[in-house]
Amino acid sequence: MKKAIILIGVLLIPILFIVLNNKNRGKVAADNVIFRDKLSDYGLFKGKIADLVPNDQGVSYELASSLFTDYADKKRVIFLPKGKKIVASDDGLPDFPDGTIIAKSFFYPNIDSLRGPKSVLLETRLLINKGGQWNAATYQWNSAQDEAVLLADSAIVPVSFLDGKGVKRQTHYIIPSRKDCIACHRQVNRILPIGPKIRNLNRVLYRANDTIQQLDYLKHLGILAISPLRKRSLLPSYEDHNQSVERRARAYMEVNCAHCHNPMGTAYMTMLDLRFESPLNETGILLKQAKIIGRMSVLGEMHMPQKGTTILHAEGITLIKDYLNSLK
């Protein structure tokens, strides 16, 4: 009898933990900005809007490792209010000033570029910071490629493209709804940016036929104030084969999984913490190796990541398999 009671207690403790944590997490606040109906209404880009040339308050940036989204390319721009700076005190997510807009546009190279534009834009996602609260929205580009309109819900777009090996692929690309955006960007009861952490911005850029360290470049532009760090960490590119399989795999999980699989994310109850900086013995990876690779390798409701992909990422799956095999 005592053994049965102990067993029931052991089984109920995780359930009680999840219930109590759900109560403490609360709800994500409603938007405190009114999103405009058209992307052009913001005046973020000058000239032909589809060229995505940022206005004078916008700065393009690149990440060391980026989210996989059905092999789509991305253009990332941060727009800051005039005279304001991004402030960083460690290698995580910096503080962005009130009024910051982060725009990320998704596109594929046009297969038939001889008879049309070089790229086909599908969507632009906006994060707008107002009063310390981030707000998320998505805009879908029209077939004329001269405007993107605010989406109230998700949308499906049939696309054809060439993958990294030059193979023609087809899929029904899914543009996320606001609810989908929140699912990935939510940390406890707040929405936060995912990509532009200092360690992920810590990479080399190619500008004017020369190379420059991106953090130094942003400081030179006068838009980044960063405290001296005893050790400025670097998130490696998971595509860089000069890095170890371990570092590449952990970087891959940081940008593709850890926004949900961390103690503050929406998948906290899985007891996986896939952040790059988390020690291996605290991640849960060793206990859930089969489940991790199994869910990456199937499509449908069981697929991971749950949002933003309709195609298996063959290169990512191979990388994670190699990493998990190295742990055995």
Regions found by a protein language model. Give the residues of each.
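Polar/charged alpha-helical tracts
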Residues: K2, D37-G43, T318, N325-S326
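Sequence context surrounding c-type heme c attachment/ligation sites in exported
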Residues: V19-A30, D112-K328
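Conserved small-residue
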Residues: R25-D90, F96, F107-N110, L121-L127, ...
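Serine/threonine-rich low-complexity intrinsically disordered regions
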Residues: M1, K38, K48, S60-L63, ...
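Bacterial Sec-dependent N-terminal signal peptides
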Residues: M1-K27
